[in-house]
C-alpha cells in the first residue's frame, strides 16, 4: 500500500489544499494530512478545529475517497512524521516559481535526511493557484466573500469565527 503525507498548517484548509489532496489520492492509496504544530505561532483555528474542518471538507468534496484520508498533528520534522506513519511519498503543492524554489530546497534537504522518502510536486490547478490561507483569513476578517476560495464547511466556520 502506498502512503503519502501532505504537511501544512491548514489554517484554514482552502480549495488549493483540496486540489493537492485530490492529486495525492491519485498517486497513493492513503493520504495523511499532517498539521504542523508551531509553538511560536497563534493559529486562527485550534488543532481540533482544523482536524474537523479538514475531515468535513474531505467528506464534502471527496465523498467516498474521504475514507482514504487521515489527519494527524506533528511537531518537529515532517520526515519524522512520515517515517512514523509509514509514508513513502511526501506531496507538495506548487502555485508558482517562488513555491518551486523553496520546495526544491526543502526536497533536497529532506532527500539527504530521508532518502527513502520521495517528494512529489503537484502543480496547482490554475483556478486555485492564487489562493492562500493568509489571504482567505484577511478577506474573511474584513467581511469579504470567501466562498470561492474554501470548501463550504470552512466558509461557515470562518463566518462564525469573525462574527463573534
Swiss-Prot record:
GO terms for molecular function: ATP binding; pantetheine-phosphate adenylyltransferase activity. One of its GO terms (cellular component) is cytoplasm. Its cofactor is Mg(2+). Disulfide bonds: none annotated. The keyword Nucleotidyltransferase applies. Its EC number is 2.7.7.3. It catalyses: (R)-4'-phosphopantetheine + ATP + H(+) = 3'-dephospho-CoA + diphosphate. Homohexamer. Belongs to the bacterial CoaD family. Reversibly transfers an adenylyl group from ATP to 4'-phosphopantetheine, yielding dephospho-CoA (dPCoA) and pyrophosphate. This is Phosphopantetheine adenylyltransferase.
Amino acid at each position: 500500500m502506498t502512503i503519502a503525507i501532505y504537511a501544512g498548517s491548514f489554517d484554514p484548509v482552502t480549495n488549493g489544499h483540496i486540489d493537492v489532496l485530490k492529486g495525492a489520492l491519485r498517486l497513493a492509496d492513503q493520504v495523511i494530512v499532517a498539521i504542523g504544530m508551531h509553538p511560536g505561532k497563534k493559529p486562527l483555528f485550534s488543532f481540533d478545529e482544523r482536524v474537523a474542518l479538514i475531515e468535513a471538507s474531505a467528506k464534502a468534496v471527496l465523498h467516498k475517497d474521504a475514507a482514504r484520508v487521515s489527519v494527524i498533528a506533528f511537531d518537529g520534522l515532517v520526515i519524522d512524521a512520515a517515517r512514523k506513519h509509514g509514508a513513502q511519498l511526501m506531496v507538495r503543492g506548487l502555485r508558482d516559481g517562488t513555491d518551486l524554489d523553496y520546495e526544491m530546497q526543502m526536497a533536497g534537504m529532506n532527500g539527504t535526511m530521508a532518502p527513502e522518502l520521495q517528494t512529489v510536486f503537484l502543480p496547482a490547478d490554475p483556478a486555485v493557484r492564487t489562493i492562500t490561507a493568509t489571504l482567505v483569513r484577511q478577506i474573511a476578517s474584513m467581511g469579504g466573500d470567501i466562498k470561492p476560495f474554501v470548501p463550504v464547511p470552512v466558509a461557515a466556520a470562518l463566518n462564525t469565527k469573525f462574527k463573534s
